[in-house]
């Protein structure tokens, strides 16, 4: 469904939607939360009696949840080890190295890790538009064994620490978002962009 926002701005600084912004996020400042919040997606603009109207498609919680479920693969590590090779991901219960539950992962999907643990790359990985998401309040150890990772980036939850002992692909940029901490333990051949949280460079 469509909504409408009316902007009235008598200040010198003007930051309004213009033609070409369709599809971009529309934000409002929430005085109670004291931060900018997403209210929807910009659909179009019009001018009525000197006021600019911005038409938006309202944020839809149900649809967003369905999209996240469709384009993510959830793995509950629960302190255990997981190995990733090509499209296979194997969870080793009780930190066993040889046996485990194997699942298929799909390119262009996010992998969501929960409850802390260890991740071992056994191949050069290309997630396409997919990234790696780590939940809140846990520690994760990522070991690349000389293999590289390429994808949309890393999202680290609040009070989580990700010890990154892996290589990011040199033809990509490591994007790090989320309030958690990325502890980079290996010298990288790629650039890094930080959207939020902390990054520790140890080499």
Where are these regions (language model features)?
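Chymotrypsin/trypsin-fold serine protease catalytic domain
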Residues: 1-14
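C-terminal subregion of chymotrypsin/trypsin-like serine protease catalytic domains
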Residues: 16-90
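Surface-exposed loop/turn motifs in large extracellular/passenger domains
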Residues: 31-35, 170-173, 190-193
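Tryptophan-centered short beta-strand motifs
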Residues: 35-38, 95-102, 142
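A short acidic/small-residue loop/turn micro-motif
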Residues: 46-47, 189-191, 203
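Acidic Gly/Asp/Thr-rich repetitive segments characteristic of extracellular carbohydrate-active
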Residues: 81-111
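Glycine- and acidic-residue-biased ligand/ion/polar-headgroup-sensing regions
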Residues: 87, 180, 194-199
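Extracellular, surface-exposed repeat architectures
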Residues: 115-186, 203
């Amino acid at each position: 469904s469509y909504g409408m926002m009316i902007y009235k701005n008598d200040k010198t600084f003007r930051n309004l939607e213009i033609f070409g912004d369709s599809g971009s996020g529309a934000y409002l400042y929430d005085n109670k939360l004291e931060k900018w919040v997403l209210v929807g997606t910009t659909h179009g603009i019009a001018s009525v009696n000197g006021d600019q109207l911005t038409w938006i498609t309202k944020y839809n919680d149900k649809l967003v949840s369905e999209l996240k479920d469709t384009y993510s693969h959830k793995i509950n590590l629960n302190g255990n080890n997981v190995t990733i090779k090509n499209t296979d991901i194997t969870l080793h219960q009780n930190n066993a190295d040889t046996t485990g539950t194997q699942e298929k992962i799909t390119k262009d999907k996010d992998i969501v890790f929960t409850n802390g643990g260890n991740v071992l790359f056994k191949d050069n990985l290309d997630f396409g538009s997919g990234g790696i998401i780590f939940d809140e309040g846990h520690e994760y150890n990522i070991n690349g064994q000389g293999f590289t990772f390429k994808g949309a980036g890393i999202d680290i939850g609040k009070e989580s620490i990700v010890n990154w002992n892996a290589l990011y692909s040199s033809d990509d940029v490591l994007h790090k978002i989320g309030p958690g901490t990325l502890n980079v333990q290996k010298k990288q051949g790629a650039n890094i962009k930080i959207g939020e949280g902390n990054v520790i460079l140890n080499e």
